[in-house]
Amino acid sequence: MSKVKIGELINTLVNEVEAIDASDRPQGDKTKRIKAAAARYKNALFNDKRKFRGKGLQKRITANTFNAYMSRARKRFDDKLHHSFDKNINKLSEKYPLYSEELSSWLSMPTANIRQHMSSLQSKLKEIMPLAEELSNVRIGSKGSDAKIARLIKKYPDWSFALSDLNSDDWKERRDYLYKLFQQGSALLEELHQLKVNHEVLYHLQLSPAERTSIQQRWADVLREKKRNVVVIDYPTYMQSIYDILNNPATLFSLNTRSGMAPLAFALAAVSGRRMIEIMFQGEFAVSGKYTVNFSGQAKKRSEDKSVTRTIYTLCEAKLFVELLTELRSCSAASDFDEVVKGYGKDDTRSENGRINAILAKAFNPWVKSFFGDDRRVYKDSRAIYARIAYEMFFRVDPRWKNVDEDVFFMEILGHDDENTQLHYKQFKLANFSRTWRPEVGDENTRLVALQKLDDEMPGFARGDAGVRLHETVKQLVEQDPSAKITNSTLRAFKFSPTMISRYLEFAADALGQFVGENGQWQLKIETPAIVLPDEESVETIDEPDDESQDDELDEDEIELDEGGGDEPTEEEGPEEHQPTALKPVFKPAKNNGDGTYKIEFEYDGKHYAWSGPADSPMAAMRSAWETYYS
């Protein structure tokens, strides 16, 4: 067994194809050699029946991962055109002179722009048949035709240049010209379907029908599981937790580390529904309304112009969203992204987005799991939850959606081109949703209120007024700091009797919201309501492919491949022993008290633990909390 780097495999393929292109062989021979080079790459990863048979199949990557690594290789040829492209475009220009100007302009464009223009032209030509049918019902040149043509112009804006001329005095000539456009355009559409734009190798770096069917079946299984394993989110608790993050001063976040960015980055994704890469690096946002922003820079759009703008909702005030996003992106932990996107060298074949996602997913997802109190949850769940909240909040009341159904709403609000993709974003349901819900500002000091209810019981607590004075001191401390932990050492500083202090802390424990931890020290009892409501039956984690393309999710740049032949199973070799998963503590987000101390809560082995004390950073506080109970 040896490690073969994906980057090396891809670079080998690229070098081989470039050498073939530069050779003086006949084009037919070049095509055969390019096809063979693509086959060698596919065999090294997945298709070699000698390598991947018997027990060797256990070492083979999944079909979905194979497709993702194929996508990486294809992206290396994205800027290269097919060897016959120029010749075929010239032929089409001569054959369809009414479209010659558009077609000829492609010859001077970058490959990405050619794809965009070709896609736009195909969309325009697909409108010919329905437009021609509607136009046949219009008596061009009659008195009532102007209004009908105006409606057609509004419905088919790409054809306005020709439709508007039908209202002129020479409408007969313009009508005949339009029909010629229709005639040539219909034939051109058929030929554009056959036009090869991409480099020849891309037509061989494709999945076989069986492999594609396998992936499609997996997607269907995932969708079926999602629709039968919905996750219920307590709306008020979830949104209150998000607002608590957004309303905290940025100074309380440790924005000098990757993991320290997680709370604010997740909260901004939660209120905008944008992907991690769009929040942290690629997206551009401008306030367009109190709860709307203009968004450009959608990820996973191969042929879309990055300047395309969408109007999306924000679940907090748009101005606050943009301000916090600017603050997050300007922090020290995000200052090296321009270097990160360059990768670690020529063998780093991940996309720029994939390189950033790789470092951020590892830093953010552990915090997300602790935020939800659910190991099944990951950062990108914020996108589906946002879509559900936005639907409940805006779909029925915003006139923008009055003529469309919910599938179109989900598709547009998430920026999808395919209406089927949004089906994967409906796993989450909301409990206790209300459009009139507003976040609590947290002004009420509940601990102080509970202590005040004990006032009448204090005069007889100790001799004289000692009990009353002790009680008043505690109330003052809690009034100054509602989250203060009151301990024996806290009250000894005020010269009260240690015996009376111990009695008082036990007596007022419920009012103070404190308990004695396993270390014998007083700890704050912080009861955070569950965000994910429990299911009646346990729901297993759904191992799913990504919603569109997995390439950006794959941060591994090497896999292990067996250099020799596939191993046949032998009687001596038994199945691998299953290793039990090691228990890991699940921490809730560290709470910075603002005085150099932190509050830490975590779950371990089915038990809840709490700790409070001084620490230099949230991570140090978590380490101290762990070592307090498990040194």
Swiss-Prot record:
Gene for this chain: gene 29
Enzyme active site: 425 (nucleophile)
Function: Converts the circular intermediates produced by the viral replication and carrying a joined telomere site to a linear DNA molecule with covalently closed hairpin ends. The viral circular DNA is cleaved at a palindromic site called telRL thereby generating a linear prophage plasmid with telomeres. Binds covalently to the 3'-phosphoryl of the cleaved strands.
Effect in UniProt of substituting residue 425 to F: Complete loss of enzymatic activity
Entry's family note: Belongs to the Caudoviricetes Protelomerase family.
Region listing for Disordered, in residue ranges: 533-592
Influence of temperature on activity: Optimum temperature is 25 degrees Celsius.
GO molecular function, one term: endonuclease activity
The protein's name in its UniProt record: Protelomerase
Pfam families per the UniProt record, alphabetical: ResT-TelK_cat, TelK_muzzle, TelK_N, TelK_stirrup
Quaternary data: Monomer. Homodimer; in presence of DNA.
Enzyme class: hydrolase
Signal peptide: none
GO biological process: DNA replication; viral DNA genome replication
